[in-house]
């Protein structure tokens, strides 16, 4: 990939938030009987991506999926790779490659290997529409409270929300995609009057309740704040930025890493 293009993709922040957080309404979905007979691969490779058909197809499997509180199988990371100075990717810095071939860019003094492998597993669940894996990566209390909130306030569930997020990401790639790179940075302070984590959990007060962050710090071993970028390859082999400069929070509890999101 062209060096200038790659750098520009990773610095572009316009594509991240809206694509990743949108949710759909279960009552708005149409019957999937006709769509379920079609191949999801065929749908994904059309020039004009059919979001409704894709959502219906994956929702059939997601509705059957079970939530899991078992730790996901994370695999391992290879040795640190330092690109040559004249390499097109040198500006991205050092990386390590996971068992699935994803390049992970991170400072291991800020973000442990297990956290990064959990992040990879988490985002790969959106690429494969695997709700069981998704649920195994998310902090259980968050999942439970978000489920209750969606049911009460919006009349749909986490599976519907998950399917909508999978569909939005696939739509951004014009079809099915696979992860190629994940970059995690320590974010700058967003608000001088408070730290990032305090501000982050204040945004979820209506869902998680008052003093949630304060109580959370007593229940877990550590809370991590990160800013990440995700690149992916579409069915045509082109690598594109999928998510840019998006905040994410992890916790470590009993040796295991969980995502809030």
Model-derived regions: residue spans:
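Bacterial N-terminal signal peptides that target proteins for export
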Residues: 1-9
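C-terminal motif of bacterial Sec signal peptides marking the signal peptidase cleavage site
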Residues: 18-22
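Bacterial signal peptide processing site
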Residues: 24-27
């Amino acid at each position: 990939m062209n060096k200038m293009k790659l750098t520009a993709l990773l610095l572009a922040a316009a594509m991240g938030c809206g694509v990743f957080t949108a949710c759909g309404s279960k009552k708005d979905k149409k019957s999937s009987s006709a769509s379920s007979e079609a191949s999801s691969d065929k749908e994904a490779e059309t020039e004009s991506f059919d979001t409704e058909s894709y959502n219906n197809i994956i929702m059939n499997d997601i509705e059957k999926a079970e939530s899991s509180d078992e730790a996901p199988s994370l695999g391992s990371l290879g040795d640190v790779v330092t690109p040559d100075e004249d390499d097109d990717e040198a500006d991205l810095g050092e990386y390590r490659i996971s068992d699935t071939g994803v390049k992970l860019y991170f400072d291991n003094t800020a973000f442990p290997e297990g956290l990064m492998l959990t992040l990879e597993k988490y985002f790969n669940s959106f690429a494969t529409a695997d709700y069981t894996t998704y649920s195994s990566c998310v902090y259980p209390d968050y999942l439970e409270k978000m489920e209750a909130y969606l049911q009460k306030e919006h009349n749909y569930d986490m599976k519907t929300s998950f399917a909508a997020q999978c569909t939005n990401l696939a739509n951004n790639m014009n079809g099915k995609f696979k992860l190629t790179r994940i970059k995690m940075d320590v974010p700058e302070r967003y608000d001088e009057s408070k730290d990032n984590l305090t501000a982050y959990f204040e945004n979820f007060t209506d869902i998680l309740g008052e003093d949630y962050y304060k109580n959370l710090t007593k229940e877990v071993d550590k809370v991590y704040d990160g800013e990440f970028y995700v690149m992916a390859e579409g069915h045509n082999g082109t690598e594109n930025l999928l998510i840019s400069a998006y905040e994410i929070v992890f916790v470590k509890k009993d040796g295991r890493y969980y995502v809030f999101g």
